[in-house]
């Protein structure tokens, strides 16, 4: 989920994304990435990057998929970053230790804290996200949709089917 570090959810603009829309956006991202590659491997930033990385890997025909596990969110608040798991030695070797020829995928770049940390680890990798906010956008090489910094994206894996009251009734 996207977040501003100090704002509460009531001050953000909701942006619900359906599975169909997310899949279309990931395929559109892949069309752009196909012009930039080839890539030796995909690295998903977990957890948000797992679903888009799977779609991108399928569409690009990539079989080497790795993860970098970075924790920055607790519920709806952004906190300190921790690398819980780095990329494997085999994947790092494919990228010559700097990430050259590797594709890093995440669902969203928000403030850029996670992106900056991953960029420091793999400075030559190509960094792609489905969605980008203005603060983090400069860190991303390829993205599909820009949203405002005060937008809160509700990804399909974070939501369930439920009644939505009409906007006229004060629904956000």
UniProtKB/Swiss-Prot annotation:
Its EC number is 2.4.2.-, 2.4.2.22. Pathway: Purine metabolism; GMP biosynthesis via salvage pathway; GMP from guanine: step 1/1; Purine metabolism; XMP biosynthesis via salvage pathway; XMP from xanthine: step 1/1. Its cofactor is Mg(2+). Guanine binds at residues 110, 153. GO terms for cellular component: plasma membrane. Pfam families: Pribosyltran. It is a peripheral membrane protein. InterPro entries: PRibTrfase_dom (IPR000836), PRTase-like (IPR029057), Xanthine_Guanine_PRibTrfase (IPR023747). Keywords: Cell inner membrane, Cell membrane, Glycosyltransferase, Magnesium, Membrane, Metal-binding, Purine salvage, Transferase. This is Xanthine-guanine phosphoribosyltransferase. The gene is gpt.
């Amino acid at each position: 989920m996207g977040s501003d570090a100090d704002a509460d959810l009531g001050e953000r603009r909701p942006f619900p994304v359906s599975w169909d829309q997310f899949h279309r956006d990931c395929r559109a991202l892949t069309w752009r990435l196909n012009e930039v590659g080839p890539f030796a491997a995909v690295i998903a930033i977990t957890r948000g990057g797992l679903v888009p990385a799977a779609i991108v890997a399928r569409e690009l025909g990539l079989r080497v998929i790795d993860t970098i596990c970075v924790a920055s969110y607790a519920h709806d608040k952004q906190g300190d970053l921790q690398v819980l798991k780095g990329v494997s030695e085999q994947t790092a070797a494919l990228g010559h230790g700097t990430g050259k020829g590797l594709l890093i995928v995440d669902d969203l770049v928000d403030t850029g804290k996670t992106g900056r940390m991953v960029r420091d680890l793999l400075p030559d990798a190509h960094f792609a996200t489905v969605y980008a906010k203005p603060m983090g956008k400069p860190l991303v090489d390829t993205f599909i949709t820009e949203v405002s910094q005060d937008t809160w994206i509700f990804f399909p894996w974070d939501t369930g089917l439920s009644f939505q009251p009409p906007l006229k009734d004060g629904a956000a």
